[in-house]
Every structure is written in structure tokens, then in C-alpha cells.
């Protein structure tokens, strides 16, 4: 299967009029044309969740501008409709179909062999691969470690909380790395990690966050997509600090979200589709680390000047040690308790 979306068309012509004299030309001409790049995105949540799903959605206008792509998307897609959504887009002739999230991996591996002329990308999944299938995996646990360093530096009570959606391996790995980051700067701290079982239930997230706050937690971190808004709301109402996830969420609560763990789904998806459009696609997983534009922390905001500087220094030092190899952030796929 061709890896570049390039079509060579041979146009045969005869009896073509040339100029006013009515002269005739016969022969053949070869043209290289670029077919329309058509990209479909399947989202498990809302395209305006101010986080994980929205960041993926924001890749579409960039692809339209950069490649002249035609794009389409489905949002709030139930798990039991993942496969049909993939098949529908492939049947409609989309060149690229993207599943936003680890949970699309199994479906992609099932569907991809049936549509060899369609490329399938699954984000946040290091396991999927095939001739026309690729997982795009940010080493998000490294950025989560930095978020933990920031949280541990800010916390006065020594109690920090992390609230996540589903207990997927890549989510667990980030939660565990966050915990390690907190303990690196505040040994003996209490780090409470909780999984909601949902990425959508804002009220459940808010109630969970309130319970942590009532127990003395003074910094909250989330990996909960739309439900994470409930975590931020609870922190804002209680007057404690919060760390966003996915994109810079300071705008959600400017006096509460002092930084965010950046996992730039937009940049990662654009990069993945660009490889297909430009013919450099390889059917094996790609990992994006702290040395890429995909991962990091958002600028430190809202904190008092001296504390802000302290956090920036601690985070910069931790990042340098990761990049140099002095600190290795492990991938821990199961909760350690």
C-alpha cells in the first residue's frame, strides 16, 4: 500500500484544438495530482470539554489549512459504537481515521485489516501497530512527574490529591508518576489517588474533590477530561490550588489553576497525519517525550512571586534531570496503593 497520498493519472488526448488555426495534437500527458486528504476524528467525549477531546478537535482546522484536508468528527461516542464509527468513516472514503484515546486500540486493530487503503491512528496508546495502523503515545508520565514536583512544592499541608477518570494503564502511569514527583520534593507527603470510573461525570468528580479537600488536601491534580472541570470547580470554591491537564486550563479558573500538565494532543495528531500525507508513515508506535513539543507544563501563574519562582526552579531542575537520564520516570501501569 502506498505510504504517500499521491496519485498518478495518465490522461490520453487526441484531436485537441490548438490555437485559432484549428491545428490538432495527439499523444499522451502524465499528471501527478494530490487527492483530497480526508481526515475523520472519533471522540469519546465532547469537542468543547476544554481539555483532552477539545485539544484533538483543534487539530482539524490546522489540517484543513496546512493540507487542504476535508475533515469530519464524531463526539460523545459510546464505547459500543467505536467500531461502527471507524467502519462508517472508512466506507465513506476517509484516508485517515483517528481514535482519540487508549480505549480505541482494540477496535482499531480489528478494523484496520479490513480497510488497507485507510490509515488508522490511535492516540495515547503505545501498543497498536500494523501496515496502516499506528499508536501515537506521549510519554505523558514524564510530564506528570513534573506536575507532581509542582504540586509538592506548592503544598503546605503535605496532602496532595490526584483524580483520574478510568483506570487505563497510561492513566495509572501518570498518576503514579505524579505521586513520585510529589515525593521527590516533599518526602513523607500524603498523596491520595482516586479513579472515578468516568471521564464525563462532573458532579462525581466535584464530590470526590470536596472529600479530599475536607481531609486536608490543598493541591488537586486531575486526568479526567470533562469531569476534571468538577475538580477545578471544587478547588476554586475551597480556595486551594489545582493543576489542569491536557492543555493550559488556567482560563477555566485563573486564580486556581496555577499550571497544567501539557499533553499537546493537537500537535501530536497534526504530526501523525503529516507523516501520512508526506509519505513518511511507519506502521509502528511513535513516542513523544519531554524533548518534543508535545509534553511539558504550562507557564506558572497565579502563585505569589517568590513561590512561583520556587516552583519554576524545581520543575526546571526535575526536567533537566529527566532529559539527562539522571532521573528515570518509570511506566507503572497498575496502582501501587
Show which residues each predicted segment covers:
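Bacterial N-terminal signal peptides that target proteins for export
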Residues: 1-6
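C-terminal motif of bacterial Sec signal peptides marking the signal peptidase cleavage site
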Residues: 15-19
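Bacterial signal peptide processing site
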Residues: 21-24
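A residue-level marker of the well-folded mature domains of exported/periplasmic proteins
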Residues: 27-337
